[in-house]
């Protein structure tokens, strides 16, 4: 059996040749999960905060902190928009979640989402040079239920520190209320990655695929396998792009969605 390359480029070669595709997929997933656990434990997560300004002598601490920083405070006080130029706010994204719908693992408790939220911040920094902060919120109310208003209030209070908000892994229907409310209430961009990000990519792929086969979006039949936040938003985007709702079918774990279902809340 071969040893893995540091780049993991030979991952498929680490397993027996007689593995079926299903066995290979399961083995790779198990391997990556165990490797992820070991690496996260070794590094203590995958994100750190590093200063980007130089310190050329001890007195430079008086520039970056007090008394020099007072000039920054009063300037921003007089014009809040200068906070985007005089602090890291313009390059800082809040990655916010209550961890109630973490990938395929469901409700992982608030802290259980940190791995994914740090992962999103990792991608932002590595691929785009944007600083992301993982913020996992306890959204339970006094009745022990997940309350979207808890997330909304938290983001509103934290807004002055960030240039944008990335909502992540919030279960439906709470995710819709959180997104719609914050987009109206905040003066910075608010983005729901699971819905809008996935929806944009899927719509782009569908448009290009239909161009290749020479078919019209309004005349094809479209099937959605799943009725979560991603697929419901994808459906809305596809309809806005010109798809015919009467030619679309959506399944959840029980079956197709239709008006005769009595197990779905209106």
Model-assigned labels for residue ranges:
Residues 139-141, 197, 255:
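Residue-level detector of flexible, active-site-proximal loop/helix-junction positions
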Residues 2-188:
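N-terminal ligand-binding/catalytic initiation module
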Residues 168, 173-174, 185-195, 216-220, ...:
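Conserved structured catalytic cores and adjacent interaction surfaces
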């Amino acid at each position: 059996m071969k040893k893995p390359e540091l780049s993991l480029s030979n991952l498929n070669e680490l397993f027996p040749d007689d593995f079926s595709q299903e066995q290979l997929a399961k083995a790779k997933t198990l391997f990556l999960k165990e490797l992820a656990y070991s690496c996260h434990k070794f590094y203590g997560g995958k994100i750190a905060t590093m200063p980007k300004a130089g310190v050329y002598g001890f007195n430079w601490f008086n520039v970056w902190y007090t008394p020099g920083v007072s000039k920054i405070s009063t300037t921003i006080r007089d014009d809040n928009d200068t906070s985007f130029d005089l602090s890291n706010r313009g390059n800082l994204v809040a990655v916010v979640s209550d961890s109630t719908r973490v990938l395929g693992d469901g409700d992982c408790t608030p802290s259980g989402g940190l791995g994914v939220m740090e992962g999103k911040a990792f991608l932002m920094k590595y691929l785009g040079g944007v600083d992301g902060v993982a913020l996992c919120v306890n959204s339970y109310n006094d009745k022990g239920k997940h309350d979207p208003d808890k997330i909304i209030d938290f983001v509103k209070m934290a807004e002055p520190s960030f240039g944008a908000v990335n909502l992540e892994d919030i279960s439906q229907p709470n995710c819709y209320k959180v997104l719609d409310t914050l987009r109206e209430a905040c003066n910075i961009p608010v983005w729901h990655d699971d819905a809008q990000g996935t929806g944009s990519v899927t719509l782009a792929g569908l448009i290009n695929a239909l161009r290749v086969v020479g078919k019209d979006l309004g005349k094809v039949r479209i099937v959605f396998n799943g009725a979560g936040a991603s697929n419901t938003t994808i459906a809305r985007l596809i309809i806005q792009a010109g798809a015919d709702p009467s030619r679309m079918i959506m399944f959840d774990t029980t079956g197709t969605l239709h008006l005769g279902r009595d197990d779905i809340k209106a």
